Amino acid sequence: MHLPPQAAGPYRSRFSYNTQTQPPEKPRSSAELKPQSPSLITEKRPRPGPKGRNRVAFNYECCNYFIIAVSLLAGSSQYTLVSGPDGPLTRRYAPTSGKPSSGPLRPRTEALSWLKAGMVWQGWGWVR
């Protein structure tokens, strides 16, 4: 019966010693972290938060407006460019009834595909 109390004594003393050494470290670390963590959180959250939100919104708005502008410009230039060469082509191929339908449609589809590819690449470039 004497050995367990003796065994418990050193364990208690070690435990109390550990608890004594740990509490000063814990309050210090918590005291150091408490002022730092709120300050860091308050500094980090508002600074990146609004900036990140503004940046994301700004990027999306820029992308939307840029894509809309490019689509409008591409659409206007596409119609003007396609209508320009198609006019003479339709006039040239006017005698033959089959060629005007196949002739002007090919440049239009090619122009559409190229414009679409350009839009996709420009969109990816702006997003990244």
From Swiss-Prot:
Residue span of region Disordered: 1-53, 85-105
Keywords assigned: Plasmid
InterPro entries for this protein: Rep_assoc_RepA4
Protein name: Uncharacterized protein repA4
Gene source species: Escherichia coli
Gene that this polypeptide is encoded by: repA4
